[in-house]
Curated annotation (Swiss-Prot):
GO terms for cellular component: nucleus. Coiled coil: none annotated. It is found in: Nucleus. Keywords: DNA-binding, Metal-binding, Nucleus, Repeat, Transcription, Transcription regulation, Zinc, Zinc-finger. It comes from Homo sapiens (Human). GO terms for molecular function: DNA-binding transcription factor activity, RNA polymerase II-specific; RNA polymerase II cis-regulatory region sequence-specific DNA binding; zinc ion binding. PANTHER family: ZFP14 ZINC FINGER PROTEIN-RELATED (PTHR24399:SF75), ZINC FINGER AND BTB DOMAIN-CONTAINING (PTHR24399). SUPFAM superfamilies: beta-beta-alpha zinc fingers (SSF57667), KRAB domain (Kruppel-associated box) (SSF109640). This is Zinc finger protein 813. May be involved in transcriptional regulation. The gene is ZNF813.
């Protein structure tokens, strides 16, 4: 005796997800799920259209006789026997339902389907079905063909169910070779237990477990599993952008892109982070943001195993390994691996500084520079050293500071092998070898290898001395000079020589003094070969060869090759005698004269004549 048989319905190949499973799907997977379900529904419908005589025997448990029922009405009939009401809204009247696919999900855990409109169907169709054992009228005529709805998803009773949306007018145009349904990859809902075992037509359709990529683009040759994906792809070649923004006129090839774009004008940010409350205009942006809280970094570099939380960051990182720099500056030809770096670089040519500080009005070419600058006003120092507890306003400064603890010096000079803990220090050092002086004074055309040296030099022209000593009122053009000067009043000498215990108020003075003990003279004159233990001494000596006397007296016009000589000479005009003897109160205009005078009080006579042994002070 043959087993009871039932018609194949969409429920036989339906795929259902629970709410928890749905949350785990990303937007691309959800879109793919929808496309698969739509295609399966089309294929089942096409079987009825291409073979209108395809019927199946259904054994009625209530009447004991056989009824001939079409696929389109079986599911509606069975829902009343099984008591399954999840699909009754679909079954009332397939012509009187209208749904609209929402292009963008309301949030990350809601199902992407909202019922927009539902037209009331006839309530007495149930009675018409069960009035007797008459076969149900064929509902698959031309009217059904012109209004055949597509499948969509909606959330109900903890399941992602299936609903119907719009008409398929081209279902009959799908060839038999294209009507191969995709085998479900998750739990298949089959509440009726009726397998279409004896149907050779269905067996033929289900032989292929995975759909072949039978839909090929004529332009690019790319193949797709589903005709809907092919249609979306072909829009790229056609340049078709049918969705236009009413505000700015920008056009898009997908409605969901237009919906997301409109939020730029409205400022709408419907997606909110539960951790920090930050809102976003796109669900993808919220998903990426959540990784900052979870620490998730799903994108990993195959070369160095470095992981990233954003796919775009991994793409940029890969260019480091490949050495790829696709973005080129049209002005100087310099290339960059990131378009943002090129944008910032272009501002060097244009002089554009679009980022302005609201506190002091200072402008910057980079937003990150403005952010760092703003911390000067707020005093914020969010970056803390775990070793010593020192805080910094910039992450890069903290990174450089950590190298003081570790002793790391990753930047090495290829010329002399000297190593540095900062990249900027290596760049400055390179200029010693190349002789490059990129910083030029606009007043006197003098050039410098360091920007700080240029800033100091400019103060000479404008006569600006912004830094004033609170003790004596003396002003300085550099804050470092003021700090050094302040030590004269305090008597502080924090730098101590380990050899003789002598103290100094400047670190450079200690370094120079240390060479007296070691005998080191690293500075050599290229003209005569004479060596010096101080760079300033070499510079003074070099002027003897060149005859250069850059220091001029404004009173008498006399010139000098050393700044100290000019200062000493200037006191002849002013009558200033800043050096005073603590013993007798006598004053002198030169420090050397005070030292000579001081020997009269001490009786010291350091200079001895070798012939007779007589000593002099």
């Amino acid at each position: 005796m043959a087993l009871p048989q039932g018609l194949l319905t969409f429920r036989d190949v339906a795929i259902e997800f629970s709410q928890e499973e749905w949350k785990c799907l990303d937007p691309a997977q959800r879109t793919l799920y929808r496309d698969v379900m739509l295609e399966n529904y089309r294929n089942l419908v096409s079987l009825d259209i291409s073979s209108k005589c395809m019927m199946k025997e259904f054994s009625s448990t209530a009447q004991g006789n056989r009824e001939v029922i079409h696929t389109g009405t079986l599911q509606r009939h069975e829902s009343h026997h099984t008591g399954d009401f999840r699909f009754q809204e679909i079954d009332k009247d397939i012509h009187n339902l209208e749904f609209q696919w929402q292009e963008d999900e309301r949030n990350s855990h809601e199902a992407p389907m909202t019922e927009i409109k539902k037209l009331t169907g006839s309530a007495d169709r149930y009675d018409q079905r069960h009035a007797g054992n008459k076969p149900i009228k064929d509902q698959l005529g031309s009217s059904f063909h012109s209004h055949l709805p597509e499948l969509h998803m909606f959330q109900t009773q903890g399941k992602i169910g299936n609903q119907v949306e719009k008409s398929i007018n081209d279902a009959s145009s799908i060839s038999t070779s294209q009507r191969i349904s995709c085998r479900p990859k998750t739990h298949i809902s089959n509440n009726y237990g009726n397998n279409f075992r004896n149907s050779s037509l269905l067996t033929q359709k289900q032989e292929v477990h995975m759909r072949e990529k039978s839909f090929q683009c004529n332009e690019s040759g790319k193949a797709f599993n589903y005709s809907s994906l092919l249609r979306k792809h072909q829009i790229i070649h056609l340049g078709e952008k049918q969705y236009k923004c009413d505000v700015c006129g920008k056009v898009f090839n997908r409605k969901r892109n237009l919906v997301c774009h409109r939020r730029c004008h409205t400022g709408e940010k419907p997606y909110r982070c539960n951790e920090c409350g930050k809102t976003f205009s796109q669900t993808y942006s919220l998903t990426c943001h959540r990784r900052l809280h979870t620490g998730e970094k799903p994108y990993k570099c195959e070369e160095c195993d470095k992981a990233f939380s954003f796919k775009s960051n991994l793409k940029r990182h890969r260019r480091i390994h490949a050495g790829e720099k696709p973005y080129k500056c049209n002005e100087c030809g310099k290339t960059f691996s990131q378009t943002s770096s090129l944008t910032c670089h272009r501002r060097l040519h244009t002089g554009e500084k679009p980022f302005k500080c609201n506190e002091c009005g200072k402008t910057f070419s980079r937003k990150s520079s403005l952010t760092c600058h703003h911390r000067l006003h707020t005093g914020e120092k969010p970056y803390k050293c775990n070793e010593c507890g020192k805080t910094f306003s910039q992450e890069l400064t903290l990174k450089c500071h950590r190298r003081l603890h570790t002793g790391e010096k990753p930047y090495k000079c290829n010329e002399c092998g000297k190593v540095f803990n900062k990249k900027a220090n290596l760049a400055r050092h390179h200029r010693l070898h190349s002789g490059e002086k990129p910083y030029k004074c606009t007043e006197c055309v003098k050039t410098f290898s360091r920007n700080s040296a240029l800033v100091i030099h400019k103060a000479i022209h404008i006569g600006e001395k912004r830094y004033k000593c609170n003790e004596c009122g003396k002003t300085f053009s550099r804050i470092s000079a003021l700090v050094i000067h302040t030590a004269i009043h305090t008597g502080e000498k924090p730098y101590k020589c380990n050899e003789c215990g002598k103290g100094f108020n400047r670190k450079t003075h200690l370094a120079c003094h240390h060479r007296l003990h070691t005998g080191e003279k690293p500075y050599k004159c290229n003209e005569c070969g004479k060596v010096f233990n101080r760079k300033t001494h070499l510079a003074h000596h070099h002027r003897l060869h060149t005859g250069d006397k850059p220091y001029k007296c404004n009173e008498c016009g006399k010139v000098f090759n050393q700044k100290a000589h000019l200062a000493r000479h200037h006191r002849l005009h002013t009558g200033e005698k800043p050096y005073k003897c603590n013993e007798c109160g006598k004053v002198f205009n030169q420090k050397a004269n005070l030292a000579r005078h001081h020997r009269l009080h001490t009786g010291e006579k350091p200079y001895k004549f070798n012939e007779c042994g007589k000593a002099f002070n």
